[in-house]
Amino acid sequence: MLHIKSLDDGLELFKALGSEIRIEIIKILLENNGMNMNELAGKLKITNGALTNHIRKLEDCGIISISNEAASHGNQKKCFVHPDKILIDIESQEKYKNIYKTNLKIGHFTDFKVYPTCGIASSNALIGEVDDIRYFTHPDRYNADILWFAKGYVEYIIPNFIPFGHKIDQITISLELCSEAPGINDVWPSDISFKINDHKIAVWTSPGDFGNVRGIFTPDWWYPNWNQYGLLKVLVINEKGTFIDGLQVSDVSINEFSLDYHSTIKLKLEVEEDAKHVGGLTIFGKGFGNYNQDIDIHINYSPIISSGDKETEENSAIS
């Protein structure tokens, strides 16, 4: 998913999509699961030079990714559509003026219960051996940039350093996820639960464990028949409810947690044993997948208003 956080940020994207031929390029690439430049130029009946200009515009705004693949006559450039969807924040976020930004490295979980197939790795090497849950306690796991398991959970503590005397109004969590199948399987659904302080706020069904092409940032040493990339998901919980990629998925609101400057905030990602689709979970961090990021978190906060302050504000409004 491509997340555009303001209309100004999306200007180059809007320009790139404001062309019939570039829309046609995207449609052809989706229909053919990617295509090399020569084939694409032939399909469109345009020169390679003209195509290169269009591809560059789509690549610059994150719509298309290009990989070099071996062919009978040397390497060739193959184009793929990068995001599965585009999320654009149109509504002004001015009411959330105070934002605390942080991130969680994939290996910084504080609790876990996982089952094989499973494993953990940094961007440089595997940590221990696959399918051995003991390595989820190895000291090197703090350096992990990817982890996967068939069912169970990992739990993180979100750093909470908002100023004294403030409450939390909204939490936004952005991370790259997919299922965990034996090998790879694009059709391997998995129901992934998101929990805050052990309270389920949302469930997202991952469609599969993706490996049809190498992840943009996945290291060269990574086995080609292992999961290569995931889907970027943006989870938001505020006073209106819980949202994934801009769509409301539950009525659970931030108000139910009464979170403030001294609250402990636990984030659990779980594939429950009794879920409809028990298809595992893979979490991608920096150095893996299609999005070079760890678990990114934004916390919006505002001053705690006492009952006396509220009464004063209401009286002022009346007068």
Residue spans for each PLM region:
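Extended, solvent-exposed segments with strong compositional bias
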Residues: 135-147, 205-260, 277
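Key DNA-contact positions within bacterial/archaeal DNA-binding proteins
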Residues: 49
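Amphipathic alpha-helical dimerization/coiled-coil segments
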Residues: 84-148, 152
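Short coil-to-beta strand junction motifs in C2/discoidin
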Residues: 185-196
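Short beta-strands within extracellular/lumenal beta-sheet-rich domains
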Residues: 145-166, 249-253
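Alpha-helical residues within the helix-turn-helix
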Residues: 42, 59-60
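Short, cationic-aromatic polyanion-contact patches
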Residues: 15-21, 36, 69-92
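A short beta-strand element within beta-rich, extracytoplasmic domains
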Residues: 167-186
